[in-house]
Amino acid sequence: MTGVQVGSFASTGHSHPPDLIWRVVGGEPRVRTRAGTTIIETPKNHVLTELRSAPPSRQAVEDLVQTDRPGVITLADGSGLIAFVPAWSGQRLYWAIDDDIVLLSTSARSIAGAVGPRLNRNSLAATLIGTLPLGISMRLSPWSGVHAAAPFEILHVDHSLAAHLIPVAPRIDPIADDEAIEEGIAQLRKSLMEAVHYRIRSSAAVTCDISGGVDSAANAYMLRALHRGFNVTRARAHSKWNLDDRWAERIVNDLHLPLIEYPSIGSTSFAYDATSPYAYGNVPETPINWSDTEGYVRSLARRRNRHARIQFTGLGGDELFSALPALAWSLVRELPLSSPRMAIRYCLNYRIPLRRGIPSLANRTGYGEHLEQCLRDLAAHGKTPDDQLAWTAGAVSFPSCMSEEAKRLSLDLPFDPGGIQPLNRDRTVHQALESLLGQANITRQLNDMFPESRTTWTSPFLDPRVIRAALAMPMRMREHPFLNKPMLYKAMRGFMPREIFARTTKGEYTSESYNAIQRDRGRLLRDLAGGALADLGLVDPKKLKTRFSMKLLSSEFLFELQRFSAVERWVRNVL
């Protein structure tokens, strides 16, 4: 659907305030109903029965925020307008107020078209910082005059058109009793199987990506356990020594399934492409960070589908089941009696001096305070300390080829970072939730950019029930001396071989990245030094040429180039 849907709420109070008018710009056809004195407007294909039977309560709204339905949901009563986008949909809520009308959408570009499309240089500059904390980047809009709400935030607009955001932290009920662990594993297993079954309930054909890793393999074994026929796809590794290939072959042979192979990820990568149009002309809402696998995705999308198809991926598995950077911080709080021994072991294992490791483990800095300190360190030193146990693991630093003006612009934010609340008080759970939201956004981008392929990309590890079940498990379930992802192993025990979890090595793809940059080196320098970002004053061409003149490019610079290429390409496609 194009155009806008218009709604209003006229108060019956004696003061007769003006009608509050809102418009949902773009998106799907919508339906409006009433529950008591409340107007409820939702996407037509996602009828919300929870709000039909009775006037919506705050609890009902909070429950809906944590689902994965797409689209803007609006509710209006005498107190004003409430709008939100379910967090796990992978979409975000954007809004603007124009001529006393509240414009809402999951597309910032649609609103920008209504209020005047001007790129926001501050947001673009911040987007160039690949290590920028997600708590900041999720609240940025690439268009001037358009505001963004982070996932798990509800927008409230009153009759005076004053807008404010209400955070709604996701509910995670941790299992504290050891006797309840087996029950928790059973619940995780049930949630995983139900998530897969829900996704294959239609008559659509099913394909499953097998990369050689644990998560994609788990998808395949769950599909087999549900007696659903499916095909297997994978991209060959560039090197014959890459063990992912060997493990993928073992899994496919064990399942006795037809395999569809594609060229290696590196040979079809768009990681260092700053000029190509997007597939089918579908420009994403924000620059993509998966351009290294875009060629593989395009190959999958080009397959001729007579019928709809479901494509399973392993996105989200690492966040749910792996040992995340802040795990040691969480463990010393989960097992306080063992914390001295764990603290010493952590410092020894990672070769960190006790005088630095112990304060990091004991640190109780709040999330908003941490974000403020990050920005102060960036302003003063151009980088932050490399603390793996902080809310945002690792160092945050300005890219080496970023202009001085861009550095200044990136720190001028339209909100107070000190007031941002964490998604969970536990740092590991918070890190997992933030990263999972990023994976949900990738899945949404895949589906938005390739609708012509009639393929729906999905992952059971991004199902809200699976997320709640996995993150409720004790943190110590993420560690095991001999197994990868021991929590997932326990949930899959009985229909997935133990050997897959006992794998001691991971695939190596660094050489593919170096091959790709060597292939595109000269062209990329020209595209970036004389491109849109340089015209906007966000990239320093002299610094770029100096770095490119070096014979060997560092891995850090390669990551910078991937980010610069993604943003440059996006800007060229929207201008």
Summary of predicted features, one role per range:
Residues 109, 121-125, 130-141, 218, ...:
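Alpha-helix boundary/capping detector
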Residues 67-70, 293-295, 438-444:
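Short, motif-level signal for alpha-helix interfacial/capping segments enriched in acidic residues
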Residues 1-270:
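Cysteine-centered catalytic environments shared across enzyme families
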Residues 79-82, 90, 172-408, 448-495, ...:
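ATP-dependent adenylate-handling active sites, centered on carboxylate activation for C-N bond formation
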Residues 60, 64, 130-134, 281-285, ...:
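Short loop/turn hinge sites at secondary-structure boundaries
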Residues 110, 119-122, 137-140, 244-245, ...:
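Low-complexity, flexible helical/coil segments
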Residues 53-57, 171-175, 179-180, 277-283, ...:
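Active-site-proximal helix-loop elements at catalytic-domain edges
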Residues 1-20, 146, 306, 312, ...:
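Adenosyl-5′-phosphate
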